[in-house]
């Protein structure tokens, strides 16, 4: 625990202003049994396109925030100005996790298919744990373009969800694939940071191939931005 303003609390429940966007509508502590538990974040690391981590092979995806890895600038062979580092995410995102599908999972092209992949549904806790380090809490992927609605309908409630096949570190066999969409409350797009430190506003109508190319550190894609 740490002491802030005379109050003792867990470090994980500390509000870090740098991690939060002023537009976030739920800039609030997450509670557990009425007690401070976690605090959310609005900036997730680039975990690549879809594949995140294979525990059996200890292999990782092509993003810049990788499980059990530290990357040097030299690893970003696509160029630091052409590679995403951080992107906006919404706090308290609903998601599915731990479907535990074995083997390779093809990257889906239709957002409406995501909920059918299954798993344990959590209605409002994605991107609420800045200390967690797993894709659905502290990252984003470029499976879909920014602010794409990934629908899951329960009765009259439509959720805009994320999905991760397996929490990193929870299985030695099931790989982590993740559709964790970059989202914001800004009209028309999301704020991002590239590996050279520059800040860019990426529009929601960016082409998917370009968006995905920006998320690979060594994909050698050739693309032109609008």
Report residues per predicted region:
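Internal low-complexity, small-residue/proline-rich segments
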Residues: 1-226
